[in-house]
Amino acid sequence: MQIPLQISFRNMDPSPAVEERIRKKAAKLERFHDRIIGCTVVVEAPHRHHHKGKLYSVRVDISVPGKDVVVDRAKPSDQAHEDVYVAIRDAFDAAARRLEDEARKMRGNVKSRASP
């Protein structure tokens, strides 16, 4: 990455353990796309007035030449995102898939549909 990883926390205190997990996941993204310019990660806990569990949201913004890849896991469909590490894993898994798709497009290895 050309620009250092940026990590921010909203509605929660920063955690060195969470930051370390994010750094490891972000480092692995370079396997999927070798031209990553920068990456910003925002981990957000719900406002304190919510009463039904804490569902964390994780947003990953990745800059590659000519495009920004944004993955936002803000509204999880299940209760698994009560664990911040699961929310991080899901966001980075989705980011890896998107980066693979972008890398394929850049190489021209995208399957095209035959016209009828």
Locations of regions flagged by a protein language model:
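N-terminal, polar/charged subdomain of small-to-medium soluble alpha/beta proteins
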Residues: 1-116
